[in-house]
């Protein structure tokens, strides 16, 4: 392709029009075949746990040591080095539990994990030939070597339920919880049907009844708490249902972290609701430059006026929360986990990059 393009440019400068035209045709044809092949090469991509790279590195180091007979003179040193390399594999995380809001574009996918077990809250969107589950959720789960024990669906809109069928194929033993009568639920999402998982309590706050096709107002609202810190998951809950929750639960709505209802739309995040939840941080799952212009500037300013720290996946990338015995920490992909190299020099930008 590249030689054909260079020759085409050269012959164009030499006024060899027909020869240049033929070379442009060759370059175009080669690119068409390349992209055709790339579509099928996608199946060869392997998503592997992070530990695999460590094992691979240890293997290569071992081969090099044997080949150069380094081990004969420094055997004790080699044993120490290999022991140090293996130590991260057996190191337990210092946090008790973790919540990740994945960057799935316009949609929602949240992973709650404790050790190597996980529960999913929503599964992102599905489109014609793929889904957020295939492109984002599965790679994340495999990278962290997580087993999905359960899936909670907030409601039936594609950007929340789209990846469900694919995830159920990959994790057939995972239980399902929703407020829909059209799904084969293992557990129904109904207010006050609370449950425990690991050391976490899942307080189910909404809805009060099951429906065949849950809409925004029927979103499965769950407050996850370890007794000290809590995360409130709201799906696409709207203003009317927020008022109902305020009337019923009042100060019990207070949570450390709030998943912003309905991607930061003006249909949600009412003042009374925010005052009672009173979170430290609010997390919004919304794509950059989406056609709905979410989150709304009006809502963003409302959170800021209430001194609530506001984060958006479209700007901050994946948002990760780590909960410890007496504290918690938040990290974002673009600022803390994997920042752009120039942020170290010039600092982070306040606008979309």
Protein language model features and the residues they cover:
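Binuclear metal-ion centers of metallo-dependent hydrolases, dominated by the metallo-beta-lactamase
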Residues: 175, 179-203, 210-216, 288-353
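Divalent metal-coordination and catalytic microenvironments
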Residues: 30, 102-103, 112, 122, ...
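Active-site-proximal loop/helix segments of hydrolase catalytic cores
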Residues: 133, 137, 154, 162-167, ...
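Conserved beta-strand hairpin/beta-sheet module of binuclear metal-dependent hydrolase folds
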Residues: 94-139, 143-144, 215-238
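Hydrophobic/aromatic beta-strand patches that form the interior of the parallel beta-sheet core
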Residues: 4, 100, 119, 152, ...
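Transmembrane helix-bundle segments that form internal channels/tunnels in multi-pass membrane proteins
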Residues: 1-100, 111, 281, 302-311, ...
